[in-house]
Amino acid sequence: ETLPNGLKIIVKEDHRAPVAVSQIWYKIGSVDEKPGKSGLSHALEHMMFKGTKDVPSGEFNRRVSELGGQNNAYTNRNETVYYENVAAANLPEILKLEADRMHNLNFSDKEFLNEMNVIREERRQRTEDTADGKMWEQAYLAAFTQPSMRASVIGYMKDLHTLKADDLRAWYKQYYAPNNAVLVIVGDVDAKQTLQTAAKLFGDIPAKAQPPRNKLHTEPYLRKPVTVKATSPVTHQPLIAINFRVPKLQKLDDTM
């Protein structure tokens, strides 16, 4: 079902256990970022847990835990996803929290600066100080020509030192909207009732005009092999990756 404000809702009943999984997918990721602003989407994912006008910083995770649930999030090249696993009876409370932060995010400059230190350390641990992280980053740089496809999801270190809190606020204001999201719910729920609950909680959030996304299919096809070699001081063990460029799934975004 699609609400008047553009939010697409998918509900799948599964009554094998009294639990439910909620996922909200935002159609925004590293492919949408401009050169010099890499890591925007991933940084905003971190800040989405820093509170709203009604839910203080850190309270989101505490409330999910209090309900006996688990939650997390991830950022990819094409999407940013937030998900929770809870007792089915507590699903409405989870949806209320997600609806709130879809349009009421409110973080301070101080929280932003603190979190950027965390993100820079995350990059050091996952990319700078690991051979496989460095290998995959170099593989994308070699395989693609468009900056949007080459960019690191977590962001390049130089960009992580120059991103501003207002960059993230503008990103949030533009892309976190019901008409740029898909809500997926699977579990021990009644589909009709769940759709009604979601419509009540998300239905009044206004839609926002969305700019066209980067056209990934315009990436030129390479008909010759590309080889890249890199060294890393953290290991003497050789790592090898063989990657193949394959055709896209036609209109996958439209299908979703």
Region spans (language model):
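Non-catalytic, conformational "gating/processing" segments within enzyme and secreted inhibitor domains
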Residues: 116, 165-201
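Short pre-active-site segment immediately N-terminal to the catalytic Zn-binding motif
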Residues: 29-38
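Active-site SXXK
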Residues: 38-52
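Hydrophobic face of alpha-helices
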Residues: 41, 57, 61, 95, ...
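Non-catalytic accessory/assembly modules
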Residues: 110-117, 124, 130-138, 185, ...
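M16/insulysin-pitrilysin zinc metalloprotease superfamily fold
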Residues: 51-54, 85-116, 251-254
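Non-catalytic beta-strand/loop surface segments
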Residues: 1-30, 54-90, 126-180, 204-251
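Bacterial peptidoglycan biogenesis and beta-lactam-recognition machinery
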Residues: 49-53, 103, 107-108, 190-192, ...
